Amino acid sequence: MSSSFSEECTPAKQKYDTCFNDWYVNKFLKGDIHNRECDDLFYEYKQCLFKALKVKKVEPLLEAARKED
Amino acid sequence: MSVYKDESEFDAPWENISSAWLRRYPNPYSSHVVSADVLERYIDEKGRLHTERLLVKQGRVPRWASELLNVSKSYILERSIIDANKRELLSETFNIDHLKLLKAMEYNRYQPSQEDSSKTSITTLAQFASPLRLGLGRRVQKYCLKRFPEQLIGSRRGILYVLQKYKSFS
């Protein structure tokens, strides 16, 4: 399983990834798209990730890329 | 701008390929991809899964690039739309830094092969545009174009590697 670009987020990311991978194969691909069992784990992971994107100054790069769309 | 097009086929059903694609990092053929983060993920009104990921690539930078701009790391944005009904995965990837040197875009479409729906066909389109002047830009684009087929083989081997590793898919 891949790491987060910010080391301290890797545990939360891997927990979320495990949930998502299982959801993708066993729910999404089988047409069960309304099941949201990984939302809480995604939220936790995102809290960590978005803080890190700010601290490590990646946010401006993302904003510039989105502006170009 | 330089453009590269390619079509290929995987001897595995679309469901397995799309699962492997989503979890293709890390793999020994993409050791330069050091991290993959999910920035955004949602299901749209048509039931399609949208994902935006941030990839960080490290090392493996040509000497002229590191000399020119002190490049050793690059941030890549990857967006995908997965339609399980249509059995289609669309992706686009592009760098969001070092844009003064190069903008590299890659588009892929994965869908069941027309002749045999237990196989998966991939269509790839890559574009390289460098804003550098004095003929340098053209050289950069040419360099990328020359290296791309090899990278493509690597990324496909990576997907197959992950596919083998998780044989229990779906």
Where do the protein language model's features map onto the residues?
Chain B
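Hydrophobic ligand-binding cavity/cleft-lining segments
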Residues: 1-61
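Terminal "cap-and-tail" regions of soluble proteins that handle hydrophobic small molecules
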Residues: 2-7, 64-72, 83-170
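Generic detector of isolated residues embedded in canonical secondary-structure elements
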Residues: 15-16, 79, 123
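Short edge beta-strand segments in beta-sheet-rich domains
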Residues: 33, 75-77, 105
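Glycine-rich portal/gate segments that line the openings of hydrophobic small-molecule binding cavities
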Residues: 39-93
